[in-house]
């Protein structure tokens, strides 16, 4: 989101750290409010016989008005967001003839209250968030309750949130928890728990990577500095496991990474991942699940001192494909900045894939072999 109106005062509507995962996180946001939905392309037409060009169907919706109210009374904070979209006129083809169809705009509403107790050096908070997206075709409502705890020592952080969705068709429920424990400086344990049933749908206003999932993710991080032969070292170990509600194990992975920082400000990063056999239940677009083989992935990255006028970065990656074959890539990035006003970068990537599995239609898949060379120059 880059629109100033929706960025200013948005903190009150942030219900958990997952709403903004950050640059170090590989996950996607989980949030009841994604303001980029406001002004997004209009809903699909109910008359499916009208053919729309992609540029026509994906044009943004204009806003009629939007207002935001935020404030605080003692330990109670509150916020209200309302945005109204204008109707969109779409031009398409029906039976070979040009037709015009008007799609009504949506009405977005979000109401938030948060009670915080920050006495001492810790924090305890409980919040409530209600959202509604109104449209002639369907009204979608969501409800979220969030709980937060920060111990006085700062070693324990707990964030819990429940999610509920309700439309005219179905209602869904879910919850997640993030638990962070830092027993000492430079050491962190993080456990995340997920439970999203098959009917949970918050996509009208929010964002959820997928529903029909339950599982956990454990991550160990250790940061060391001022070592005898290194300027710093970071170590990450991750274990992930997920199931769908049919009982199929849809995700299982063991990952390890280490970043070494040398005294000359160069960096070396090593990664190794192992993904045991599991079920893939999404790529077939609702046409069933299929079994993936054991797979390995490894990567090596080396970076020179980026503070110098000339710097470079080398990357090499090897990953096994879903049911056999390999993906191999090598890249080189060069950067030259003689002054603050002039900078030049050149990126070069070479990639080969064998056994690249893609879904065609129904239960049919096809494996491809590919080779690509992608140079990029920026001044």
Question: What is the role of each PLM region?
Answer:
Residues 62, 160-379:
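Exposed, low-structure sequence patches enriched in small/polar residues
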């Amino acid at each position: 989101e880059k629109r100033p109106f929706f960025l200013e005062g948005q903190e009150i509507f942030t219900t958990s750290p997952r709403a903004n995962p950050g640059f170090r996180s590989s996950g996607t946001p989980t949030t009841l409010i994604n303001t980029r939905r406001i002004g997004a392309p209009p809903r699909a037409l109910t008359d499916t016989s009208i053919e729309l060009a992609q540029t026509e169907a994906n044009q943004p919706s204009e806003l009629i008005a939007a207002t935001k109210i935020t404030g605080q009374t003692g330990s109670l904070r509150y916020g209200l967001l309302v945005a109204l979209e204008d109707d969109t006129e779409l031009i398409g083809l029906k039976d070979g003839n040009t037709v015009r169809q008007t799609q009504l705009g949506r009405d977005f509403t979000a109401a938030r209250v948060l009670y915080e107790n920050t006495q001492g050096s810790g924090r305890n908070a409980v919040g409530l968030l209600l959202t509604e997206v109104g449209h002639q075709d369907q009204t979608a409502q969501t409800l979220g309750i969030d709980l937060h705890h920060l111990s006085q020592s700062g070693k324990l952080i707990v964030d819990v949130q429940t999610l509920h969705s309700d439309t005219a068709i179905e209602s869904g429920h879910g919850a997640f928890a993030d638990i962070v424990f830092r027993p000492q400086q430079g050491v962190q344990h993080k456990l995340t728990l997920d439970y999203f049933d098959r009917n949970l749908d918050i996509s009208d206003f929010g964002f959820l990577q997928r529903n029909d999932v339950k599982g956990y993710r454990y991550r160990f991080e250790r940061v060391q500095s001022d070592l005898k032969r290194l300027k710093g070292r970071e170590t990450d170990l991750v274990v992930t496991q997920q199931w769908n509600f049919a009982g199929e194990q849809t995700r299982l992975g063991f990952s390890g990474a280490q970043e070494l920082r040398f005294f000359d400000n160069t960096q070396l990063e090593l990664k190794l991942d192992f993904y045991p056999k599991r079920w893939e239940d999404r790529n077939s677009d609702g046409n069933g699940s299929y079994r993936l083989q054991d797979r390995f992935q490894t990567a090596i990255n080396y970076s020179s001192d980026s503070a110098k006028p000339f710097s470079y970065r080398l990357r090499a990656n090897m990953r096994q494909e879903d049911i056999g074959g390999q993906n191999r890539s090598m890249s080189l990035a060069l950067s030259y900045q003689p002054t603050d006003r002039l900078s030049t970068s050149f990126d070069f990537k070479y990639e080969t894939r064998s056994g690249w599995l893609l879904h065609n239609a129904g239960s049919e898949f096809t494996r491809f072999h590919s080779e690509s060379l992608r140079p990029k120059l920026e001044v």
